[in-house]
UniProtKB/Swiss-Prot annotation:
Pfam families: YbaB_DNA_bd. SUPFAM superfamilies: YbaB-like. It comes from Shewanella sediminis (strain HAW-EB3). This is Nucleoid-associated protein Ssed_2851. PANTHER family: NUCLEOID-ASSOCIATED PROTEIN YBAB.
């Protein structure tokens, strides 16, 4: 099935890919993205591990409806989470050469 040294090369390649994926996972955890809502009136900065680092609210919103502000904060959080997911997929595609992960498998593992 494998030529001379084929299995050894395959194992070496698998180890290299695993090392690259671990490095990318660390980079993803350290990255920060900012999600926005209300045309930038509410901004949420989130890490690659989905921890919210900062919430920025335009002062003009503090005089308005509390419920609207809550909705905008939730929307900005969701936008930031979506951006984290997009960045994770892009970075992992670079490592895996575009190979798709099985459905339901998320990165980092």
């Amino acid at each position: 099935m494998f030529g001379k040294g084929g299995m050894g090369n395959l194992m070496k390649q698998a180890q290299q890919m695993q090392d690259k994926m671990a490095k990318v996972q660390e980079e993803i955890a350290r990255m920060e993205v900012t999600g926005e809502a209300g045309a930038g009136l509410v901004k949420v900065t989130m890490t690659g591990s989905h921890s919210v680092r900062k919430v920025d609210i335009d002062p003009s919103l503090l005089e308005d409806d509390k419920e609207m502000l809550e909705d905008l904060i939730a929307a900005a959080c969701n936008d930031a989470a979506r951006r984290v997911e997009e960045n994770q997929k892009e970075r992992m595609a670079e490592v895996t050469g575009g190979m798709q992960l099985p459905p339901g498998m998320k990165m980092p593992f």
